[in-house]
């Protein structure tokens, strides 16, 4: 099994078409026959032929894919902080409102963020569906609006067992 999603990515301020490789797997009885290698080469050739300059994947094993010629372009960072480490509420004008994950203002805020953030993917409809496909139903989206009711920022989060997990 093998899939390549067509996406765009901000690379140093320029928008590039990329191929996002996902769902790379094979049945155990077919491992060691070079099937994935053939599929990968064929997909990379097709991406090149369709003017996609970059191919991306989230590897389950960095050493394995590094040995196959892939390299890391970003890191996933996790922070654990106690509630007492968060500053007390600041007196900022504006307000926060929860919205549905398919809210257009939320999507526009992400597109604005992607346009100014190196390495960020622009999400098309398929990418938005995949973004929330495996999340728990309680995942929430909140938008901050300034004093002029303009959306200025967002947070995607889940509260589970009295712990807030911020996805982005």
What are the residue ranges of the model-derived segments?
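Residue-level signal for alpha-helix termini/capping positions
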Residues: 48-49, 133
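Conserved acetyl-CoA-binding loop-helix of GNAT-fold acetyltransferases
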Residues: 23-26, 32-45
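Amide-forming acyltransferase catalytic core, primarily the GNAT-like/NAT-type
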Residues: 76-168
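Short coil/turn motifs at secondary-structure junctions
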Residues: 7-9, 29, 62
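Conserved active-site alpha-helix within GNAT-family acetyltransferase domains
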Residues: 49-53, 59-77
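Conserved beta-strand in the GNAT
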Residues: 1-7, 18-20, 25, 149-159, ...
């Amino acid at each position: 099994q093998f899939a390549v999603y067509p996406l765009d990515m901000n690379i140093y301020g320029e928008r590039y078409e990329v191929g996002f490789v996902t769902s790379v797997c094979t049945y155990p009885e077919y491992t060691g026959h070079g099937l994935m290698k053939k599929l990968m080469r064929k997909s990379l050739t097709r991406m090149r032929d369709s003017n996609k300059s970059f191919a991306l994947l989230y590897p389950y094993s960095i050493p394995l894919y590094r040995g196959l010629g892939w390299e890391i372009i970003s890191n996933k960072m996790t922070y654990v902080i106690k509630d007492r480490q968060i500053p007390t509420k600041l007196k900022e004008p504006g307000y926060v409102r929860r919205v549905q994950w398919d809210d257009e203002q939320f999507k526009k805020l992400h597109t604005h963020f992607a346009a100014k953030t190196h390495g960020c993917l622009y999400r098309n409809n398929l990418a938005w569906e995949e973004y929330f496909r495996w999340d728990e139903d309680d995942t929430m989206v909140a938008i901050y609006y300034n004093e002029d009711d303009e959306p200025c920022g967002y947070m995607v989060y889940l509260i589970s067992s009295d712990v807030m997990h911020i996805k982005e």
